[in-house]
A protein has these predicted regions:
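Long, charge-dense low-complexity segments
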Residues: 1-247
Length: 247
């Protein structure tokens, strides 16, 4: 009996030692991973504060990615390019289609019919609401970028709002620019956005704003994203640059 008890105790101690060794190894790996991630964050922050183009692009990509919109109908897809020479950020942003606006203005219960009936929106209301959405996203995006510019890396930003849809006349896929604005940061930050008429505000900034975005009436972008010169660093270039940095 004593021998079996002693053997059981030895087995328990061996199991405990193995469990502790496994725990210590996992703890060490976790601490190393935390240290590595913290070092990466510190390195990224240092690069961003130094206005390194790759870091500026990656930072602003994170700013826009964290912007919250409804999940239905709002693509939240975008492309970014940055010129360190002019401190200009160019954003090509995918806007929701007009179908994102519900066709029904309201629902009401009709007691005599014991049914719920809907009231359709008027076409003029849909037009106004959609134009307001386009202008709101444009101003909001510029505001978020400039407000988040902790490194003071941006002197101005260009926003091109695009609609990816199908041409109702041909059925072909089309990509239509419906708003384009180039805004100096200091001028923009002086605006009282809560007081402005959004479309009038954009036009005062020199924006090209479609009168009928609901009908895919296009505008000419102030800067064509695909035509930016080699001084601009784009998202793919920025990621490659950050990954190639020495550890």
């Amino acid at each position: 009996e004593v021998a079996r008890f002693n053997q059981a105790e030895v087995t328990k101690r061996e199991q405990f030692s193995k469990l502790k060794a496994d725990y210590d190894q996992r703890k060490s790996q976790f601490e190393m991973e935390v240290w590595r991630r913290n070092a990466e964050v510190d390195e990224f922050q240092t690069a961003y504060r130094a206005k390194e183009p790759d870091a500026v692009v990656a930072y602003n990509e994170m700013v826009l990615a964290r912007s919250e919109y409804p999940t239905e109908g709002f693509p939240q897809k975008f492309r970014i390019a940055y010129s360190p020479d002019s401190s200009e950020l160019i954003v090509e942003y995918d806007l929701p289609e007009v179908q994102a606006i519900p066709k029904e203005a309201e629902y009401r219960y009709v007691k005599t019919k014991d049914a719920i009936e809907s009231k359709a929106r008027k076409p003029t209301e849909i037009k106004q609401l959609y134009q307001d959405i386009v202008a709101s996203i444009t101003l909001r995006t510029l505001h978020e970028l400039f407000e988040a510019d902790q490194a003071d890396a941006l002197a101005l930003a260009t926003f091109n709002g695009m609609v990816d849809t199908h041409d109702p006349a041909s059925g072909r896929e089309v990509r239509v620019p419906v708003v384009s604005v180039r805004a100096p940061k200091m001028e923009f930050l002086g605006l009282r956005l809560e007081k402005v008429d959004k479309v009038a505000c954009l036009r005062n900034l020199g924006a090209q704003v479609s009168n009928r975005p609901d009908e895919l009436q296009a505008v000419k972008p102030i800067v064509e994203f695909d035509m930016v010169d080699k001084r601009f660093i784009e998202q793919g270039d920025a990621l490659s640059g950050l990954e190639a940095r020495p550890n």
